[in-house]
Amino acid sequence: TVVLCTDIFDEFMMSNNLYPIALSDASDDEILKHFLHAQLPDSLIADFFTFFEATRSPIAIRSSSLLEDAHYQPFAGIYSTYMIPYLEDKYQMLQMLACAIKGVYASVFYRDSKAYMTATSNVIDQEKMAVILQQVVGKDYGTRFYPTMSGVLRSLNYYPIGDEEAEEGIASLALGLGKYIVDGGQTLRVCPYHPNQVLQTSETELALRDTQTQFYALDMKHVGNDFKVDDGFNILKLRVKDAVEDQSLTYIASTFDPYDQVINDGVYENGRKLITFSSVLQHGVVPLPEILQMSMKYGAGAMRRPVEIEFACNINNDRTCEFYLLQIRPIVDAKEMLDEDVKAIPDSDCLLRSHNSLGHGISEDVVDVVYVKYDDHFSAMNNFYVADDIERINRKFLADGKNYVLIGPGRWGSSDHYLGVPVKWPHISAARVIVEVALKNYNIDPSQGTHFFQNLTSFGVGYFTVDTNTGEGGFVNKEILDAMPAVEETQYVRHVRFEHPMRIL
């Protein structure tokens, strides 16, 4: 790992006179174009060549900024992270690395970043950016590069199940690059202290429905300087069955036998492959649960607060493995005491009630509700359009300095629109409370484990999950909302306003 310190960012910005365009209202593409045409200091070239020789692998170019890692209010996933393949032509690799660094610098000034600054009362020209160059963990499969396993580990579990304790933490595991996890993809959620209790694989039907079907890999053939605002421009989105030919599933997959309707641990020729990590979690091929327990213990101990850790792991055919800690950041767990007995408030007095909620404090100044139109026949096909409507409405709230309650089915902030509405944090940054609703035909795990979720908790935004499928999952009194006149209404979204402020506890 190599760090380019903030003084290089300062020199780059000043010597190329980039602040006028960076702080303007120019589009993200226009800002990136100016940054890519600018020059990095020549003094870095020799160091970069030395780094190439030392790593001889693909490189991740990550942001590490002053505000991003603040203990009191950390950002997560707002700035760009690029990856470049390893090339034998060192000068071509140097060009790609330079473009990636400039792309990370440019992302500080994109529209989403500026909206984020506004929402968090930070001043963008006070931001300082360091860049981390890190060897990408993984194996080379010819045209693609990815690790056996990536994960996000949180030492605080806001949704413990059964005999799990909140302080025992939760890990989200996936095949392939970790970008899939932080983008909100379908992962396997497991508590390191209870590796045998995985809800998603507890029943055959759940395992078939709720396990990973896609994964991300670095495209080793994508060579050139055509960098885009989307930092995933050279990331391949593959199906799990594509990994079968790479023979990378040996210790992390199970096979569904359609004739006997059972799931067998291991990879067999016939039947759908399911990413269950059973050989790792239940059969001890590698001591992953123990490693995760140790990582949480020392990570939280060093930061003196709960932490979120990104990690990756390669598992070899001889059952050896290499485990890498990639990033660690604090989880803001602000708490405020509530004296009122919420259970004593009758349901008839409530617009919505959740038995799984996160947040703190009492809010008594919100009068607006923005909600996705849904019923028991809801289809996720239109979630892209929903995201556009909500981003536009959110901009109006930001301009007016007001907040709202946001309600919708599925997982907010997922990059997979089948799992929920694919908004980014700045697109809903004026929301005071965010509600995820599980429906009969659309029952998705909550957002915990994504950068999006981390930002909700950091900024004290109320986060409620409501499961309409169980009598104990809470409720949304949607009939009240549907009967109200709309302040604004689109094909997919309604905005209504109450005469008096709601009381949010």
Question: Model regions: which residues?
Answer:
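Polybasic, proline/glycine-rich intrinsically disordered low-complexity segments
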Residues: L439-P485
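A polyampholytic, Gly/Pro-enriched intrinsically disordered region
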Residues: Y19-A26, E310, F452-F459
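A conserved helix-loop-beta module that forms one wall/lid of the active-site cleft
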Residues: T1-S24, D28-D42
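Conserved mixed alpha/beta core segments that line enzyme active sites in large multi-domain catalysts
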Residues: Q39-A438, N455-F459, A483, T490-R503
